[in-house]
């Protein structure tokens, strides 16, 4: 299991309004922009901007991450061997595959394995 990248989640009211500020802070355009369920997301540097209806914010705040890994299945095997529990997934998304795991300390973490195209686009 290799961690390739982590993001700080930031909840914003409007992605189109917030995105230019974070692109300016980072000094680069967004690496990714996509919809997921009721949310619209953009990855800029090490920030993951999330815009969603107020009623859905708590659902997205309940987990930490995403933690981008090289191999989701291997990561799940390693984590469950240390008493982590899969609480959701693995699922397929626009960027690859993901799963939610609860660590023995109670932390709920989202793990993502990017598709080869997304990995190449973001990491080079």
Regions found by a protein language model. Name each.
Residues 1-19, 63-65, 115-124:
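N-terminal beta-strand motif that seeds the catalytic metal site of vicinal oxygen chelate
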Residues 5-13, 41-43, 55-124, ...:
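Vicinal oxygen chelate
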Residues 15, 36, 93-95:
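Short strand-connecting beta-turns/loops that link adjacent beta-strands
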Residues 16-25, 99:
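Conserved active-site alpha-helix within GNAT-family acetyltransferase domains
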Residues 17, 74-76, 110, 120:
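Intrinsically disordered, low-complexity acidic/polar segments
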Residues 26-34, 85-90:
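Short secondary-structure junctions
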Residues 28-62, 108-115:
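Conserved short beta-strand elements that form part of the metal-binding/catalytic scaffold
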